[in-house]
Curated annotation (Swiss-Prot):
Residues in the signal sequence: 1-26
Keyword set includes Signal: yes
Keywords of the record: Signal
Protein name (record): Uncharacterized protein YmzC
Positions of disulphide bridges: none
């Protein structure tokens, strides 16, 4: 009986050592990268601008063009209806 208790104690100690090793091993391998935007960026990606229109239509202004789309609710699809250059509307 004493032999089995000693064996269980050794197993318990081994499990504690494995847990401690895994805990500190996992904590030591974390690399943290922090990116900050300081506002000195010369390049900005152009963002499309959308605006609602009447009767399931909407417009998207992108790269100097205005595109008019129609949304069909029954088929859940969007269809390009017209496209204008930005300077045509002035």
């Amino acid at each position: 009986m004493f032999e089995s208790e000693a064996e269980l104690r050794r197993i318990r100690i081994a499990l504690v050592w494995i847990a401690v090793f895994l805990l500190f091993g996992a904590c030591g391998n974390q690399d943290t990268i922090i990116e900050t935007d300081n506002g000195n960026s010369d390049y900005e990606t152009p963002q499309p601008t959308s605006f609602p229109l009447e009767h399931n239509h909407f417009g998207v202004m992108e790269d100097g063009y205005i595109k008019i789309y129609e949304y069909n609710e029954s088929r859940n699809e969007v269809k390009l209806k017209k496209e204008y250059a930005d300077d045509e509307l002035e």
